[in-house]
C-alpha cells in the first residue's frame, strides 16, 4: 500500500482489507465478551431477522466471529428484549461496486425475508479512487433493490478524510444523508463517530476496531438499529 494511502488512513480509519468470507448467521456468543453479558429484559416477540451487509468493519477483521459487530449487535438487541437474529454479510475489501454485484444474490440466499438490511459501504471506495458519484449510484441501486423487496434499509454513513480536499470531502460526506432523504431510509450519519478519535480503540493498522472498539460502536448504534426495525419500540 502506498505511503500516501497510509497517511489517508491515519487521518481517518477506513475499511480496507482483502479476503472474502461467506455471509453467515451469527451464533450466540460466549457472554464473557458480549456488550451485554446477560439479558436486561426478557426476549419476546417475533424473530427480527437483520442482514448486516458491508466490508471488513462488519466481517470482523482480525477478531473472533463472536466479537464482530453483527454478533455483538445481535447480543445487544437481545439484551434490550428484541428477538433479533443478525446475519453477518460483511466481506473484507468490498467497495460499493463489489457490494452491488453480490447484494441481490445475498438477499436471495437467505432462508428468510429480513426485517432490516444494514448497508455499511464506502470506506474502501475512498482508497480505491472511486468518485462520490459512483459510490452514491452503487448504494442507491442497493437501496432500490431492497425497497423492491419491501425490506427497510439502515445506512451506516462514512466520512472522507481531509486529505482529499474540501470539494471531494463535501460531496462524499453528503451522499449518505442525500440518499437517506431521497429514499426515506434510516441513517447513522457517521457510524464510527464514537471511536474514531481514540487510537486505543483500533488495531495496530489504525483501520479496524479492537474488540473494545466494536463494543463501543455497538453501544453507540444499537438504539438506532432497534429504531429502524419495523414496529419496534425504542
Regions found by a protein language model. Give the residues of each.
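Sec-dependent bacterial lipoprotein signal peptides
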Residues: 1-15
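Conserved Rossmann-like nucleotide-binding pocket used by diverse enzymes
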Residues: 13, 87, 154
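Bacterial signal peptide processing site
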Residues: 17-21
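Sec-dependent signal peptide cleavage junction
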Residues: 22-29
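Serine-esterase "nucleophile elbow" of acetyl-processing enzymes
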Residues: 29-92, 104-113
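Short histidine/acidic/glycine/proline-rich micro-motifs that form metal-
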Residues: 57-60, 64, 90-95, 124-126, ...
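Alpha-helical cap/lid subdomain in secreted, periplasmic
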Residues: 100-234
Amino acid at each position: 500500500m502506498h505511503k500516501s494511502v497510509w497517511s489517508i488512513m491515519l487521518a481517518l480509519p477506513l475499511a480496507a482489507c482483502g479476503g472474502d468470507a461467506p455471509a453467515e448467521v451469527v451464533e450466540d456468543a460466549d457472554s464473557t465478551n458480549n456488550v451485554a453479558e446477560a439479558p436486561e429484559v426478557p426476549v419476546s416477540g417475533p424473530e427480527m431477522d437483520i442482514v448486516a451487509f458491508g466490508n471488513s468493519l462488519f466481517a470482523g477483521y482480525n477478531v473472533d466471529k463472536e466479537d464482530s459487530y453483527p454478533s455483538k449487535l445481535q447480543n445487544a438487541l437481545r439484551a434490550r428484549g428484541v428477538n433479533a437474529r443478525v446475519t453477518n454479510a460483511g466481506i473484507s475489501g468490498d467497495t460499493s461496486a463489489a457490494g452491488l454485484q453480490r447484494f441481490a444474490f445475498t438477499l436471495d440466499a437467505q432462508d428468510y425475508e429480513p426485517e432490516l438490511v444494514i448497508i455499511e459501504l464506502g470506506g474502501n471506495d475512498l482508497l480505491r479512487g472511486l468518485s462520490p458519484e459512483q459510490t452514491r449510484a452503487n448504494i442507491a441501486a442497493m437501496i432500490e433493490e431492497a425497497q423492491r423487496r419491501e425490506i427497510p434499509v439502515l445506512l451506516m454513513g462514512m466520512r472522507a478524510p481531509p486529505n482529499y480536499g474540501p470539494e471531494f470531502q463535501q460531496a462524499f460526506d453528503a451522499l449518505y444523508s442525500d440518499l437517506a432523504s431521497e429514499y426515506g431510509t434510516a441513517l447513522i450519519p457517521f457510524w464510527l463517530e464514537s471511536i474514531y478519535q481514540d487510537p486505543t480503540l483500533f488495531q495496530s493498522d489504525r483501520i479496524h476496531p479492537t474488540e473494545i472498539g466494536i463494543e463501543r460502536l455497538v453501544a453507540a448504534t444499537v438504539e438506532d438499529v432497534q429504531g429502524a426495525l419495523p414496529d419496534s419500540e425504542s
